[in-house]
């Protein structure tokens, strides 16, 4: 069996970014050593992004970071930003927007579920309401109002107004609909799809709904699609989140808001992974960028951040970009075992450190893979 080499560009970013990336790398190295399913080698290339890049180079995304990302199989990102860099002309978050655009990462995937039923009690909602919640938000990431034409207040003739534009094309909506459909078809039976929009008010949402319907009818007639207005969906998410189980597809801004709302259901942002893909994972080798849903947590002392979201992002990477499904399943099971055993950071009412949780996952995934040999 020949060794397959997979190149991963690591962009730790700012504050806790370095710590969580370190734990994720340890997990990948453990999988490389222990997996009986293939001979695989992970090659890591470390580069700057965000505030760390601004401090070192003056820009939030240096050219060498972008070039490294483009030439790798996948990108692992820590977190960017912090009060140190403020809201001036050059901001850490610009690096994130630029890399998404430059790598054409058009689909953001954010699962909302419980890594372990032992965590149900941590949800701010009642256990009986959230038990069984399991959906993935598929958010369009490079179109819509965040990338539309705009005018700042200072640029207006009277200095009294500002505007942004929400624009979507049929091609953009078709592409994200296919991604959602593909994610639904990865399951047996296929998952239902919910499309969220504001078609009762917005022209862009009417195009969105019409295009989603056309693509689903012509290309995926075996799948079920239901439309929900975004404000109604926001209510359902709190009242009865399991109603949205399946795949939830929506635009850039609506997806930004609804996925953040969904992120509080499992009780901690420290649990939630995300993937941003540039192509369909139809051969389990889509190019993607993987990062936790939480931010850089500048106020958190060292060795306190929860590494689980980043480790579960690695599980998504193994499944969608690195063609390592068995290893992804083993890693998710390892996380479940560690959380069930009570090894947890403070955000999950635990007493363990970042490194202790990371080491526990390394030990668990190593055992699972070796037992499978």
Swiss-Prot record:
SMART domains (UniProt xref): Iso_dh
Site label Important for catalysis, positions: 146, 198
SUPFAM superfamilies: Isocitrate/Isopropylmalate dehydrogenase-like (SSF53659)
Binding residue positions for substrate: 100, 110, 139, 231
Catalytic activity: (2R,3S)-3-isopropylmalate + NAD(+) = 4-methyl-2-oxopentanoate + CO2 + NADH
Entry keyword annotation includes Manganese: yes
InterPro entries noted in UniProt: IsoCit/isopropylmalate_DH_CS (IPR019818), IsoPropMal-DH-like_dom (IPR024084), Isopropylmalate_DH (IPR004429)
Obligatory cofactor(s): Mg(2+); Mn(2+)
GO CC annotation terms, alphabetical: cytosol
GO biological process: L-leucine biosynthetic process
Subunit note: Homodimer.
Function: Catalyzes the oxidation of 3-carboxy-2-hydroxy-4-methylpentanoate (3-isopropylmalate) to 3-carboxy-4-methyl-2-oxopentanoate. The product decarboxylates to 4-methyl-2 oxopentanoate.
Name this protein carries in UniProt: 3-isopropylmalate dehydrogenase
Source organism phylogeny: Eukaryota, Fungi, Dikarya, Ascomycota, Saccharomycotina
Gene name linked to the record: LEU2
């Amino acid at each position: 069996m020949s060794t397959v080499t997979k190149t991963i560009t690591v962009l730790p970013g700012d504050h806790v970014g370095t710590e969580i990336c370190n734990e994720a790398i340890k997990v990948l190295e453990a999988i490389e050593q222990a997996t009986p399913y293939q001979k695989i080698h992970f090659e890591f290339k470390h580069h700057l992004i965000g505030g760390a890049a601004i401090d070192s180079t003056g820009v939030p995304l240096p050219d060498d970071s972008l070039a490294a990302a483009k030439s790798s199989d996948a990108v692992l990102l820590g977190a960017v930003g912090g009060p140190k860099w403020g809201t001036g002309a050059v901001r850490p978050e610009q690096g994130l927007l630029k890399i998404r655009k430059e790598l054409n990462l058009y689909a953001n995937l954010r699962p909302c579920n419980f890594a372990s039923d032992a965590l149900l009690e941590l949800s701010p909602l009642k256990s009986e309401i959230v038990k069984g919640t399991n959906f993935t938000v598929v958010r369009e990431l490079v179109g819509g109002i965040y990338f539309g034409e705009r005018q700042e207040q200072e640029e207006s003739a009277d200095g009294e107004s500002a505007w942004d534009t929400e624009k979507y094309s049929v091609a953009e909506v078709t592409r994200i609909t296919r991604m959602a459909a593909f994610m639904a078809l990865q399951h047996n039976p296929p998952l239902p799809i919910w499309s969220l929009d504001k078609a009762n008010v917005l022209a862009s949402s009417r195009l969105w709904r019409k295009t989603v319907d056309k693509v689903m009818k012509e290309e995926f007639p075996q799948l079920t699609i239901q439309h929900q207005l975004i404000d109604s969906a926001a209510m359902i998410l709190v009242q009865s989140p399991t109603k949205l189980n399946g795949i939830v597809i929506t635009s850039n801004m609506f997806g930004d808001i609804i996925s953040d709302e969904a992120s509080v259901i499992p009780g901690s942002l420290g649990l939630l992974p995300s993937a941003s893909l540039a192509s369909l994972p139809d051969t389990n080798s889509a190019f993607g960028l993987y990062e936790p849903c939480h931010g850089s947590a500048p106020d958190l002392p060292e060795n306190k951040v929860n590494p689980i979201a980043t480790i579960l992002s690695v599980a998504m990477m193994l499944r969608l970009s690195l063609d390592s499904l068995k290893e992804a399943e083993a890693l998710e099971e390892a996380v479940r075992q560690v959380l069930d055993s009570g090894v947890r950071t403070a955000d999950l009412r635990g007493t363990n450190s970042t490194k202790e949780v990371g080491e526990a996952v390394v030990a668990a995934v190593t055992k699972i893979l070796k037992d499978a040999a």
